[in-house]
Design a protein with these regions (language model features):
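Conserved, structured C-terminal
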Residues: 1-29, 35-37, 42-45, 121-123, ...
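Acidic, proline/glycine-enriched N-terminal capping motif
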Residues: 1-105, 110-112
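N-terminal glycine-rich flavin-associated loop
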Residues: 64-78, 118-126, 166-168
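Residue-level detector of beta-strand structural context in well-folded domains
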Residues: 70, 102, 115-116, 198, ...
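Short coil/turn segments at secondary-structure boundaries
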Residues: 70, 74, 112, 128-132, ...
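Well-ordered mid-protein domain cores that form the structural environment of catalytic cofactors
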Residues: 93-123, 127-144
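A short, hydrophobic C-terminal helix/tail in secreted or cell-surface proteins
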Residues: 399-403
C-alpha cells in the first residue's frame, strides 16, 4: 500500500538528476532529494574529489545544483509586511531588484530556518528556504495567514518544482555568466551588485532569474530557470565553465566552502539554537516585532553561559577530528562537556582540518585556549583550539541590516 517503502517516503530528484549522473556525480540523499555528493575523476576518493572541487571554486569557478532549496512565491499588496513579521531582520525597506538573507524564528525564539527573499516587484517576492525545512516553512506560512493574520492580503505558493537552480561560484563566475546571457551588461558589478536581483535571458532565449548571492564567500551567483530548461542551462554553463578550468561541485565541497567561512546550516541550526547562539544577533531588528521576538529575550535564552558558535582548529594541525565530538576542559573530561562540534572538513585554503561548533561562553571566553575534544564513539581524544567561526577572511559583506 501507500504507507510502506518508497510510497511512504519517496525520493525526489531535480530536473538535472540524469545530467548530473551522466557527468559523473555520485549522489546522496538530502531532505528526500537526491543531490550530487561529489564528482570523482578516475580513481578519486570522496576526499580527493571534494578537496579538488573546493580548491577549484576558490581559484576559478564551479557549478553546483541547488534546485533542492525550497522555493516559495509570495505575492500580494501586504507581502512586505508579511515578510517583516516572519523574519527577525527588517524587510520593509528592501528595494525592488534586491535580495536579503533572513532568519525565521519559532514562537519560542529558537531559529526555525534561514534563506533569502528576492524582491522581484513591488508586491512580489521569491523566497528560498533550506532543503530540509522547505515543507515545514511552507506549512508555517500558510498557518500564519489562515489563523493569525487573516487580514493580510498575501498569497503564498510553493514553486519548488517549477524552478531549477544552480550556484555559479568563484573568481571567474562573472566571466562564465557573461558568456551565457544575452546581454553581458546585466551581470556587471554596477548593474548587479552584491545581493542584486535581475530577470534576463540566457542564450537561446531562455528566461532566467539571477541573484548575486554567495554561500562560499567567493563572488557567486544563483541562476534559476523554469524546470523544462534545466538541462539546457547546465549544458550552457558547463560549456563555458570548462573554458576557465572550472568544475562541477557537489554537497561535500559546498560544505567545505561554507565551513571555512562560518556559514551555518541544519547541522548548527538543529532546533535548540537561538539567533544569538549562532552569532547572528546583529540581524535581529530592534525596531519591530516579529515571530519569536518576545520569547528570544527570555532569561534562559540570554544566559551568558549558553553555547555560542565558534571555529575549531586541531592543536596538532596534522590531526583529524569528527562532528559529534564533545568539547571539554583539559581537567574535566566528562559528561556533556562545555560544547560540541557540529561540522568538520579538511580546508584546502588552510591546509588542515577545521570545524564549526558551539562552546559555552563563545569565542570571547575561550579564544586561542586549548581544549580537549572527546570522541567516545571512536575512542579518541584530541587537543583543540577555539578560533573565530570565520576561519578565512570574508570577501563580501551582507546588506541585511536592521531597517
Amino acid at each position: 500500500g501507500r504507507n510502506v517503502g518508497k510510497h511512504f517516503r519517496p525520493l525526489r530528484v531535480t530536473p538535472m538528476h540524469q545530467w548530473n549522473i551522466d557527468h559523473g556525480a555520485k549522489m546522496i540523499e538530502v531532505g528526500l532529494y537526491q543531490r550530487p555528493w561529489y564528482y570523482p575523476k578516475e580513481n578519486e576518493t570522496l576526499s580527493d574529489s571534494y578537496i579538488r572541487e573546493a580548491s577549484t571554486v576558490r581559484k576559478t569557478v564551479g557549478i553546483c545544483d541547488v534546485t533542492s532549496l525550497g522555493k516559495i512565491a509570495i505575492q500580494g499588496p501586504d507581502s512586505t509586511e508579511f515578510l517583516n513579521r516572519i523574519y527577525s531582520n527588517g524587510f520593509s525597506k528592501l528595494q525592488v531588484g534586491k535580495a536579503r538573507y533572513g532568519i525565521m524564528l519559532r514562537d519560542d525564539g529558537i531559529v526555525m530556518d534561514d534563506g533569502t527573499s528576492w524582491r522581484l516587484a513591488e508586491n512580489e517576492y521569491f523566497m528560498t528556504t533550506s532543503t530540509g525545512e522547505a515543507a515545514k516553512v511552507m506549512s508555517w506560512l500558510e498557518e500564519l495567514l489562515q489563523t493569525r493574520w487573516t487580514d493580510l492580503n498575501v498569497n503564498v505558493t510553493s514553486v519548488s518544482e517549477q524552478w531549477a537552480g544552480v550556484s555559479v561560484a568563484g573568481p571567474k563566475s562573472r566571466e562564465v555568466l557573461n558568456n551565457c546571457v544575452d546581454d553581458s551588461l546585466v551581470v556587471t558589478n554596477n548593474n548587479l551588485p552584491f545581493m542584486g536581483v535581475t530577470s534576463t535571458f540566457l542564450k537561446g532565449n531562455i528566461p532566467c532569474r539571477i541573484a548575486r548571492i554567495s554561500f562560499s564567500g567567493e563572488l557567486a551567483f544563483e541562476v534559476y530557470v523554469k524546470s523544462d530548461f534545466a538541462n539546457t542551462m547546465m549544458d550552457l554553463l558547463w560549456e563555458n565553465a570548462k573554458k576557465y578550468d572550472g568544475c562541477l561541485y557537489g554537497l561535500e565541497a559546498l560544505g567545505a566552502l561554507r565551513v571555512e567561512k562560518g556559514h551555518v546550516t541544519a547541522a548548527e541550526l538543529d532546533g535548540r539554537v537561538t539567533i544569538d547562539d549562532a552569532g547572528l544577533s546583529k540581524m535581529a531588528s530592534t525596531k519591530k516585532s516579529y515571530i519569536g521576538s518576545a520569547m528570544r529575550k527570555r532569561g534562559v535564552l540570554k544566559n551568558n553561559d549558553r553555547e555560542i558558535l565558534v571555529g575549531f582548529f586541531p592543536t596538532n594541525l596534522k590531526e583529524t577530528f569528527n562532528a559529534g565530538t564533545i568539547v571539554c576542559e583539559k581537567n574535566n573530561i566528562k559528561g556533556q562537556g562545555i560544547g560540541r562540534i557540529t561540522s568538520v572538513t579538511y580546508s584546502p585554503e588552510l591546509g588542515h582540518w577545521i570545524g564549526l561548533g558551539f562552546v559555552k561562553g563563545g569565542l570571547d571566553k575561550w579564544k586561542d585556549t586549548n581544549l580537549v575534544g572527546a570522541d567516545p564513539v571512536r575512542n579518541k581524544q584530541m587537543n583543540l583550539k577555539v578560533v573565530s567561526p570565520h576561519m578565512i577572511c570574508l570577501l563580501y559583506t551582507s546588506d541585511a541590516a536592521d531597517d
